[in-house]
Amino acid sequence: MKAKIYINYKEGILDPEGLTVSKALQSIGIKGINNLSIGKCIEVELNCKTKEEAIEIIEKSCSKLLANPNTEVYNYKIIKE
C-alpha cells in the first residue's frame, strides 16, 4: 500500500519560500498569481494490510515528526496497489 502526504503551512502563517517564489515569478514577467504557498509532498510505501492500519501509521508519523502542529497542517491520500 502507498500513500501521499501533503504538508502545508496553516492559514495565516508566513511562508517565506512561497513569498520569494511569488516575487521571482513577478520579476520575470509572470502575472496573475495572487497567492503562492510552498508545501511538501511525501510519498511512502507502507507495510500494512488494511486501510485502517495505514491511516494509523500516517497519523502517528505526521503528528509525531513529519508536520509541525504549531505551524503546519497535513492531509493524505492512500493508494492501494
What are these regions (language model features)?
Residues Y9-E11, C48, K80:
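Non-catalytic surface loops within mature trypsin-like serine protease
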Residues G12-P16, K49-E56:
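Short, conserved charged micro-motifs
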Residues K31-S37:
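N-terminal glycine-rich anion-binding loops that anchor highly charged ligand groups
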Residues M1-E11, K40-E43:
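Short glycine-/aliphatic-rich beta-strand segments at the starts of folded cytosolic domains
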Residues G12-I30:
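Short amphipathic alpha-helix segments
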Residues I55-E81:
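C-terminal structural segments of small proteins and small subunits
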Residues Y6, L36, E45, K77-I79:
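Solvent-exposed beta-strand sheet faces enriched in polar/charged residues
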Residues L14, L25, L46, L65-L66:
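Generic leucine side-chain signal with a strong bias for well-ordered alpha-helical environments
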